From Swiss-Prot:
Pfam families: ABC_tran, oligo_HPY. InterPro entries: AAA+_ATPase, ABC_Ni/Peptide_Import, ABC_transporter-like_ATP-bd, ABC_transporter-like_CS, Oligopep_ABC_C, P-loop_NTPase. This protein is a component of an oligopeptide permease, a binding protein-dependent transport system. This APP system can completely substitute for the OPP system in both sporulation and genetic competence, though, unlike OPP, is incapable of transporting tripeptides. Probably responsible for energy coupling to the transport system. Residues 5-256 form the ABC transporter domain. This is Oligopeptide transport ATP-binding protein AppD. One of its GO terms (cellular component) is plasma membrane. ATP binds at residues 41-48. Keywords: ATP-binding, Cell membrane, Competence, Membrane, Nucleotide-binding, Peptide transport, Protein transport, Sporulation, Transport. Belongs to the ABC transporter superfamily. GO terms for molecular function: ATP binding; ATP hydrolysis activity. It is a peripheral membrane protein. SUPFAM superfamilies: P-loop containing nucleoside triphosphate hydrolases.
Amino acid sequence: MSTLLEVNNLKTYFFRKKEPIPAVDGVDFHISKGETVALVGESGSGKSITSLSIMGLVQSSGGKIMDGSIKLEDKDLTSFTENDYCKIRGNEVSMIFQEPMTSLNPVLTIGEQITEVLIYHKNMKKKEARQRAVELLQMVGFSRAEQIMKEYPHRLSGGMRQRVMIAIALSCNPKLLIADEPTTALDVTIQAQVLELMKDLCQKFNTSILLITHDLGVVSEAADRVIVMYCGQVVENATVDDLFLEPLHPYTEGLLTSIPVIDGEIDKLNAIKGSVPTPDNLPPGCRFAPRCPKAMDKCWTNQPSLLTHKSGRTVRCFLYEEEGAEQS
């Protein structure tokens, strides 16, 4: 599969009294056309800031891309002006945000919000855009699409609002869909329906997905490949099968063993000790060392590089130093 998105050495910093705070620090990954890649990690790991950097929205939150490149096919998005971004945002790259209630405009009807995108990006006439909006709502599972067009967001349930967000995000047949915790506020049944819907629609349009989540159950259902982030860095990158069968990084292992199991007796839930360091108070060596059960002396003073493991996946850990090649 050919590469759609390539992120190289991405560094996104925030500033406190002119002091740089690294929220994303040297992130590398790629997404192929038609591939679903999950970006996972605890809160504060840099997942959402990575997605906002790709969308060109991090500046509005006070952040700044300090280094690296974000290439969408042959376009380097880091060189884009806001006007350039406006042409691709919602068109070639779309995003579903965590909470649909705060993402939808409360004073506009659902129909107005979908047709606005089509009129702006596809130069459709109002009547044509309205017809397409009805088709999109039917496509995401609304049987009363004409009625939903007239409703305001507060009149819809959480699952219905999320379906509307998916309809808006896919309205222009984007090449890349970024879904930031798309099932967080939904119950388990609606979660499954939304994931299945995203999967079906993206297969239909050959859309690539960057799925941002901390829910490994969602990852196992929806992703082809998984990128694990910790403290603004990628610590492991593997296919979903490899990651669940044999996690390499101690942090990935900790995430997987903390998932509760249904069968067998459970004395107590496993948990990773400690908490994620804040970006303004990072350890001098490996960022996971203070919480790692396998930490060695050099982990406390030296930062490990991202290595290509003999299995073909990448991992940032001194445990695999002898059997891996450092990424250039």
